[in-house]
Amino acid sequence: MDYKREPLEDVEIDVLKQACGSFEESLIINVLLETGMRVSELAKLRKEQISWQRDCITTVGKGGKRRVIPMSKKTRFYLSEYFVNKEKIEWGSRWIQKIVKRIAEKAQILKKVSPHVLRHTFAVCYLHKGGNVRALQEILGH
């Protein structure tokens, strides 16, 4: 299948995760890969949007669409650690984009890597694991 934005291969995902040099970098890479969130949604994420009981994140995306994103155990770990003494993510979209690019360069991944490529990678992985197309559209807000 040809993609406009080339998703990362499994080995590239592993190398990208290993290249993270701090908790914050690991949070950014893992949450984007595990949820398919837009960079702007991560940058605006607030503690009150997370349902720890239902393992999901409620976000408002493009066009004011409200949607619920399932939260994996890994995402839950990173967000619960981050939000111990914070109420919201304290990074801007541009900063997150720069961090993702820097980690990809450190990992020596040759293809273009951006938060949107991580979102696309999430979608492709979801479908390869047998995920439902309609459910994926709901998660991504399409």
Residue map of PLM features:
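Conserved catalytic core of the tyrosine transesterase superfamily
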Residues: 1-142
